């Protein structure tokens, strides 16, 4: 996978690509949807947007497809409120995205009314239960296309976007050390299963976890021998009171870690 350097987790991206990703991440933060979500925060959104870009590049998406994928990634968890179920939040997110773009026809994401239904389908589908391991539920996608009145002549494009967002979201399961940890068998695209991509997902999550732990403990360095993802997960599960907003990474810190 040429886009990822051998000395990962840094990615070999051109400046214009970095700017495109950074713009989406900043705009997602500015919506305010993720300000109070501790477990699906901007750290998660930023990584899913980045994974989406890497997958989309390797899959040779068109410029229009890439835009729709990145915006879907930016909004995919906007429906989470901390008390939702896995299925409800995706439908709620599709609804919130619809409300956002309807109220903001001129928006920083450059999404128009014709593109919105496609984004809603992709957001809604990202937590859809699939019957076969690692395979899209095409009947489910067809149902959502009808539900949101998305263009039926673009069903192949929509299926591809659904596949890539699901895989991008799944790759960030490397932020979990035990329950919910990534199982590559659930990935759908060959690109997501590439050793370079799996290694990148694992290492970038270690980098993020180390940075957050440094804030929590007020130290300059975390030992390389420590599994930072596992330690941070234990703190989240057992000592949530330690993890206020002051220990979250700000947007510039997030972008610096990514690039």
Describe the residue ranges of each PLM region:
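Amphipathic alpha-helical segments within well-ordered protein domains
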Residues: 53, 94, 98-102, 106
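Short alpha-helical hairpin
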Residues: 2-31
């Amino acid at each position: 996978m040429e886009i990822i350097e051998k000395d990962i987790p840094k990615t070999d991206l051109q400046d214009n690509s970095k700017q495109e990703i950074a713009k989406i991440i900043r705009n997602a933060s500015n919506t305010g949807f993720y300000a109070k979500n501790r477990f699906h925060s901007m750290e998660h959104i930023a990584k899913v947007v980045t994974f989406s870009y890497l997958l989309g590049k390797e899959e040779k998406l068109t410029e229009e497809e890439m835009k729709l994928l990145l915006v879907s990634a930016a909004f995919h968890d906007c429906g989470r409120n901390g008390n939702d179920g896995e299925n409800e939040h995706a439908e709620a997110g599709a609804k919130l995205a619809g409300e956002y773009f309807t109220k903001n026809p001129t928006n920083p994401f450059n999404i128009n009314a014709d593109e919105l239904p496609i984004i809603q389908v992709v957001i809604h589908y990202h937590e859809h239960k699939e019957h076969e391991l690692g395979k899209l539920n095409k009947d489910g996608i067809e149902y959502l296309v009808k539900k949101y009145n998305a263009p039926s002549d673009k069903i192949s494009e929509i299926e591809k976007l659904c596949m890539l967002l699901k895989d991008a979201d799944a790759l960030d399961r490397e932020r979990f050390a035990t329950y919910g940890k990534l199982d590559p068998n659930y990935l759908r695209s060959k690109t997501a299963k590439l050793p370079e991509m799996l290694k990148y997902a694992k290492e970038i999550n270690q980098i993020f976890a180390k940075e957050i732990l440094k804030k929590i403990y007020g130290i300059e360095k975390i030992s390389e021998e420590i599994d930072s993802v596992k330690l941070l997960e234990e703190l989240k599960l057992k000592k949530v009171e330690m993890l206020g907003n002051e220990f979250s990474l700000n947007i510039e810190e997030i972008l610096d870690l990514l690039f």
